[in-house]
């Protein structure tokens, strides 16, 4: 259990860290593009081997491609939201809202069933979101909710895709298609010259954040093999509380105590949602 605890908490810290790095970047979209491009390059050999061995079929690649397209929109919206909204607002709402939207999407599109306890969990999450949004400009809350909706959308797609493959190969495919999708988005936005020019200067950040994102996934995967999913989720989603604390103490954002209480409420709701499934 100690190993699972360390892995889950480590994943929470890593996920918060790379999001904070993006928030503090001068060009948030470029930072996110570099993250996914680097993650795709790192994950490509694994995905190729899994495809050749048959562990990663064409059906899974189809779902991964759809997920990559949604990720491209997600990256664009997340970058824009980090430009206009506080870190301690965007991150908790996006993460909490994403899990809530994913649960609802699972019922609508994957024939999942929610128990009474899970529905109570959703209500608790909504309460936390309401508390967090209560004294925040809607121009900040709205974009964060859109990010959460996109997270919920690609989570539902990935849930379907992961059921059609073996092991963690699908996660590598997501990074590959996400990197391709984001690159195509950059080309469509006529940012190729900026993307190319940023690589010699920013490649260390791109590689470190891309690797951190991949390692985050692996740590959660290893943790759930050693401990109950609900326990791991509780520790993993503690990242929303950590983000609120960082926003308050490091980034000097306002309403720190209120945002920490709201984020903690969302964690309780998310854990209740998972345990009730």
Regions found by a protein language model. Give the residues of each.
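Short hydrophobic alpha-helical membrane-embedded segments
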Residues: 10, 33-41, 93-101, 119-120, ...
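Membrane-interface interhelical linkers
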Residues: 1-69, 73-87, 134-145, 176-226, ...
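Hydrophobic transmembrane alpha-helices of multi-pass small-molecule transport proteins
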Residues: 37-43, 100-107, 114-133, 258-277
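Functionally critical, cavity-lining and gating residues within the transmembrane helices
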Residues: 74-75, 102, 154-155, 213-217, ...
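Selected transmembrane alpha-helices and immediately adjacent juxtamembrane segments
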Residues: 139-172
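Specific alpha-helical transmembrane segments that line the substrate/conduction pathway
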Residues: 66-71, 80-126, 171-179, 229-249
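C-terminal appended segment following the main domain
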Residues: 219-277
């Amino acid at each position: 259990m100690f190993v699972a605890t360390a892995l889950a908490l480590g994943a929470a810290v890593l996920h918060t860290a790379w999001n904070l790095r993006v928030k503090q970047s001068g060009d948030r979209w470029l930072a996110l593009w570099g993250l996914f491009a680097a993650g795709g390059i790192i994950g490509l050999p694994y995905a190729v081997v899994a495809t050749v061995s048959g562990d990663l079929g064409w059906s899974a690649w189809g779902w991964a491609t759809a997920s990559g397209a949604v990720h491209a929109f997600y990256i664009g919206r997340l970058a824009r939201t980090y430009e206009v909204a506080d870190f301690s607002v965007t991150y908790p709402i996006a993460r909490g809202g994403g899990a809530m939207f994913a649960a609802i999407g699972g019922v609508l599109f994957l024939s999942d069933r929610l128990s009474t306890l899970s529905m109570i969990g959703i209500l608790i999450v909504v309460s936390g979101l309401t508390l967090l949004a209560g004294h925040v400009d809607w121009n900040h809350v709205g974009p964060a909710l859109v990010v959460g909706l996109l997270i919920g959308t690609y989570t539902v797609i990935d849930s379907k895709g992961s059921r059609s493959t073996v092991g963690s190969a699908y996660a590598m495919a997501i990074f590959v298609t996400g990197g391709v999708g984001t690159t195509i988005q950059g080309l469509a936005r006529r940012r190729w010259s900026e993307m190319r020019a940023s690589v010699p200067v920013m490649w260390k950040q791109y590689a470190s954040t891309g690797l951190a994102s991949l390692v985050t996934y692996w740590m959660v995967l290893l943790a759930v093999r050693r401990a109950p999913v609900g326990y791991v989720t509780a520790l993993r989603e503690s990242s929303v509380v950590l983000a609120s604390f960082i926003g308050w103490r490091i980034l000097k954002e306002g309403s720190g105590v209120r945002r920490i209480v709201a984020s903690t409420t969302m964690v309780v709701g998310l854990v209740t949602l998972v345990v009730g499934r």
